[in-house]
């Protein structure tokens, strides 16, 4: 699957909700006084910049495959401390690094566990690999996108995107126990957990808004030159999402399951 394109402004609409898993992930890193920290899939750099406060002696590098995201992240750059660059996690091969963070990015990387040996080899004793991925199993959003995109009306224009999108057993995301096993066999001490965040979202069609800057973007990008078709497609998506996540008087509940893994080299 090709790297998707993201909308930094849309992504930031739910900045607080997206920041919480990042904070929960990085809070479990216990590497003492790291000198080099890499944040893979750094997005607009808002959370990457906070790492400089936690680790004042470290050089922080944020990497993202989206040029739009890196352009947005540059405002958080601090000469000699925090920098950003366009890059692909699949091709990133460090020589040495103290802490590797990959928050909500590896779900887009097929067979990402094959990258772990190289990353672990780059870590010193007590160095850390910390990542978080949305758990696809039992989460209906991606299936709704794929099903509508593959329907007779949209198949010719969106069918290829729907086929390439990870799904069910074909999703790159593995069971949390598999991550523990793989990393333990590489000589890591692993802290892992699986949890669900229940977000209360406001506004009309907030679940579609949440994913408009990320998972829905490949589909809408393909229709961006046809405003009428784009509006029709979004209307179909919105209707399905309202059925799956019905609004309540206080807002719309979005239960979002996530897997967390923090592994330290022994």
Residue ranges and their predicted role:
Residues 36-40, 44-92, 114:
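Class I SAM-dependent methyltransferase SAM/SAH-binding core
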Residues 109-110, 123-125:
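Helix-to-beta-strand junctions that scaffold the AdoMet/dcAdoMet cofactor pocket
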Residues 90-100:
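A short acidic, Gly/Pro-enriched loop at the edge of an enzyme's catalytic core
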Residues 113, 128-203, 226:
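Conserved catalytic/acceptor-binding region of the Class I
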Residues 99-112, 135:
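A short SAM/SAH-binding and catalytic strip from SAM-dependent methyltransferases
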Residues 3-6, 18, 186, 190-248:
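C-terminal helical/coil "lid" or tail adjacent to the Rossmann-like core of SAM-dependent
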Residues 1-38, 46-50, 69-72:
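Conserved class I S-adenosyl-L-methionine
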Residues 259-266:
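Core SAM-dependent methyltransferase catalytic element
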